């Protein structure tokens, strides 16, 4: 490896070609789809959950790089682009993903813009103390223009946490929710059916969704708190946009067809327009 290479992303500084914007979807499979809608798409590297492409939009170079799921892998992506590759404070990092709404009025297919995140992720504590806010740091005027152009329906606070207990899931096994405190999930572990109950030892998240709803939190996801905390504390600019694939007041797991159509419409088309407004 040359000195300019990074351990996980497999990129060199030269690969960026002066890019000052990095679009960061979670899913590696979305990266090529996003890059293909822009000019001169080039695949740079693919290693584990990190797939990276470079493309041009209105003559300006940008990077599309997946983060994988959750805060720790997301932090690697931010660290290796911003620190090792020397991306400066002009850099915009729009986090693009899918999400579950927790407010009844938010519909599947809606576009949400996060202004701040509830830091339930854990990883963000490695970059700033809990008292430090996880806030959007995009330039206000351009961010406002981007919100209008992508048809954002709701702007507000997001909760970043784990997929199961942090987002208070009970019915993943498919059983009816009769009594939350007694419902368990059955998982196949080492080819044997064993009973597993997320809430049998730590109960702090029982009833938490209703508390977040009362405080006006609009959705759950798993990465924005890490991205926003890291960038805000290091003088970088970042924002979060997400397409709603399920409303948690109605069901816990999204319908497969709904998820596919929402991802296709949102992640591949809307993000390019948002990037154009932010460049």
From Swiss-Prot:
<dbReference type="GO" id="GO:0004850">
    <property type="term" value="F:uridine phosphorylase activity"/>
</dbReference>
<dbReference type="InterPro" id="IPR018016">
    <property type="entry name" value="Nucleoside_phosphorylase_CS"/>
</dbReference>
<comment type="subunit">
    <text>Homohexamer.</text>
</comment>
<dbReference type="Pfam" id="PF01048">
    <property type="entry name" value="PNP_UDP_1"/>
</dbReference>
<keyword id="KW-0328">Glycosyltransferase</keyword>
<keyword id="KW-0808">Transferase</keyword>
<dbReference type="GO" id="GO:0009164">
    <property type="term" value="P:nucleoside catabolic process"/>
</dbReference>
<protein>
    <recommendedName>
        <fullName>Uridine phosphorylase</fullName>
        <ecNumber>2.4.2.3</ecNumber>
    </recommendedName>
</protein>
<comment type="function">
    <text>Catalyzes the reversible phosphorylytic cleavage of uridine to uracil and ribose-1-phosphate.</text>
</comment>
<comment type="similarity">
    <text>Belongs to the PNP/UDP phosphorylase family.</text>
</comment>
<dbReference type="InterPro" id="IPR000845">
    <property type="entry name" value="Nucleoside_phosphorylase_d"/>
</dbReference>
<dbReference type="GO" id="GO:0005829">
    <property type="term" value="C:cytosol"/>
</dbReference>
<keyword id="KW-0963">Cytoplasm</keyword>
<dbReference type="GO" id="GO:0044206">
    <property type="term" value="P:UMP salvage"/>
</dbReference>
<dbReference type="InterPro" id="IPR035994">
    <property type="entry name" value="Nucleoside_phosphorylase_sf"/>
</dbReference>
<comment type="pathway">
    <text>Pyrimidine metabolism; UMP biosynthesis via salvage pathway; uracil from uridine (phosphorylase route): step 1/1.</text>
</comment>
